[in-house]
């Protein structure tokens, strides 16, 4: 009976070893793809930073102008005025939607929907970054632990070359995983701040439009 349990134990250990080591190459490939993606993210962040335009006084002036045009019954021109403000694409699309809603009597309700949709769109854009923050270090840890088994076997057999090769893989995957997580976290924080600022500006635009509408009433 004891021999049977021993055989089952040895078989289970061998299967665990085979399954765990089988994940090494997919893990390395996934890490390299994530690393390339994170570098592309960093480049897109720099490009977005150089192209972002925010002029609060200009936005305020355009919003007040649009409010005056709407009060005069020139809703189409008011929408064109809002669309003329140069800003990030998501905010620009939201301003266009707000401009179109000026032509209806459901402006307040439409604004709430536009704002909610914009918040969801921004959250959706940040989701891959949140995944990258977690996935990078997790894959890095997997890439560290998986080669440790073969490394210990090599050490027990006096195979220094096998030990060294596996340790190199272990340390390299750790570093790459942490770099991926760090880049994703930095991009997440910076873009999150930009998106919150865009939402704040959008709310300010609508408050200006509402204020002029209330004055007219």
Residue ranges and their predicted role:
Residues 62, 66, 91-94, 98, ...:
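Amphipathic alpha-helices that form helix-helix packing interfaces
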Residues 194-217:
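Cytosol/matrix-facing juxtamembrane amphipathic
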Residues 2-5, 96-116:
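Short, charged cytosolic
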Residues 69-103, 217:
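Acidic, Ser/Thr-rich low-complexity segments on the non-lumenal side of membrane proteins
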Residues 32, 36, 88-91, 108-111:
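Short runs of predominantly hydrophobic/aromatic residues within well-ordered alpha helices
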Residues 89, 105, 109, 158-161, ...:
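Generic alpha-helical secondary structure signal
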Residues 1-84, 116-198:
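Hydrophobic alpha-helical transmembrane segments of small proteolipidic membrane proteins, enriched
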């Amino acid at each position: 009976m004891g021999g049977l349990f021993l055989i089952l134990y040895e078989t289970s250990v061998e299967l665990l070893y085979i399954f765990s080591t089988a994940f090494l190459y997919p893990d390395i490939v996934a890490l390299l793809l994530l690393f390339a993606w994170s570098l592309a993210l960093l480049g897109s962040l720099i490009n977005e930073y150089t192209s972002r335009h925010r002029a609060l006084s200009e936005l305020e002036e355009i919003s007040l102008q649009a409010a005056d045009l709407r009060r005069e019954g020139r809703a189409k021109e008011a929408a064109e005025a809002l669309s003329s403000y140069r800003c990030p694409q998501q905010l620009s699309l939201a301003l266009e939607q707000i401009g179109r809603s000026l032509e209806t009597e459901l402006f307040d309700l439409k604004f709430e929907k536009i704002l909610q949709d914009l918040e969801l769109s921004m959250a959706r854009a940040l989701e891959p970054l949140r995944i990258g923050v977690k996935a990078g270090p997790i894959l890095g840890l997997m890439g560290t632990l998986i080669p440790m088994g073969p490394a210990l076997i090599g050490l027990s057999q006096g195979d220094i070359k096998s030990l060294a090769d596996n340790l190199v893989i272990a340390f390299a995957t750790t570093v790459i995983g942490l770099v991926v997580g760090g880049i994703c976290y930095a991009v997440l924080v910076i873009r999150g701040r930009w998106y919150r600022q865009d939402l704040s500006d959008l709310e300010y635009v609508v408050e200006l439009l509402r204020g002029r509408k209330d004055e007219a009433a």
